[in-house]
């Protein structure tokens, strides 16, 4: 997003060194995976395979592989977390703000995979076959957020916004769901949206 245009790879003199931040991020990912396992989430898809991409939303394998249509939403999370931490924690080095973003994303992944939220998704959205993410999918979602955060750090604001809008429109038209609709339907399900989401892909 290049709002902090002077930001470049940091050294210890500029704040939190990249290697330390990387160690913290890897530790947080390990904690996320461990807690998810303790919550009863399966390590990989129960189908026994790990796919790089799974594009069938209405399937028991959705949110079980490395990437899917919802990966784009997690990239947008990274855009938003970069913008938010830049606004609120502007004096912090970008490496420290990345750790904050990973903490937020990890907390959401744990919340999303709680029994309450899983049932909320199943009752209020099109995710009737959703029984929680596999651990590999959840960790991959956090990595997608990290990629979005890093992209936002380097891209101009206009490019970042354009990419986010493009993702939302194209994904929304293809699977009739996206980050915006997901949040709306999680907070307050609307029958009109649910009925619209039941239709076939528009593109």
Curated annotation (Swiss-Prot):
Pfam family, one: DUF2585
Transmembrane parts of this sequence: 20-40, 69-89, 155-175
Localization, UniProt: Cell membrane
Entry-linked InterPro entries: DUF2585
Keywords, ordered alphabetically: Cell membrane, Membrane, Transmembrane, Transmembrane helix
Topological relation to the membrane, as annotated: Multi-pass membrane protein
One cellular-component annotation, GO: plasma membrane
Family: Belongs to the UPF0314 family.
Name of the molecule in the record: UPF0314 protein RPA0307
Organism classification: Bacteria, Pseudomonadati, Pseudomonadota, Alphaproteobacteria, Hyphomicrobiales
């Amino acid at each position: 997003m290049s709002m902090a245009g002077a930001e470049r790879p940091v050294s210890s003199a500029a704040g939190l060194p990249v290697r330390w931040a990387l160690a913290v991020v890897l530790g947080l990912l390990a904690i996320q995976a461990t807690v998810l396992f303790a919550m009863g989430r399966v390590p990989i898809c129960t189908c026994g395979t790990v796919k790089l991409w799974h594009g069938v939303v209405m399937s028991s394998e959705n949110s079980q592989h490395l990437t899917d249509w919802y990966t784009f939403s997690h990239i947008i999370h990274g855009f938003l977390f970069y913008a938010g931490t830049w606004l609120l924690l502007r004096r912090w080095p970008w490496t420290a703000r990345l750790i904050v973003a990973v903490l937020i994303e990890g907390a959401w992944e744990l919340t999303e995979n709680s029994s309450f939220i899983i049932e909320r998704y199943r009752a209020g959205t099109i995710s009737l076959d959703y029984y929680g993410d596999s651990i590999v999918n959840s960790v991959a979602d956090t990595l997608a957020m990290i990629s979005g955060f890093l992209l936002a750090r380097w891209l101009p604001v206009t490019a970042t916004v354009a990419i986010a809008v493009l993702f939302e429109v194209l994904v929304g038209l293809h699977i009739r769901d996206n980050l915006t609709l997901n949040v709306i339907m999680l907070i307050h399900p609307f029958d009109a949206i649910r009925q619209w989401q039941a239709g076939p892909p528009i593109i």
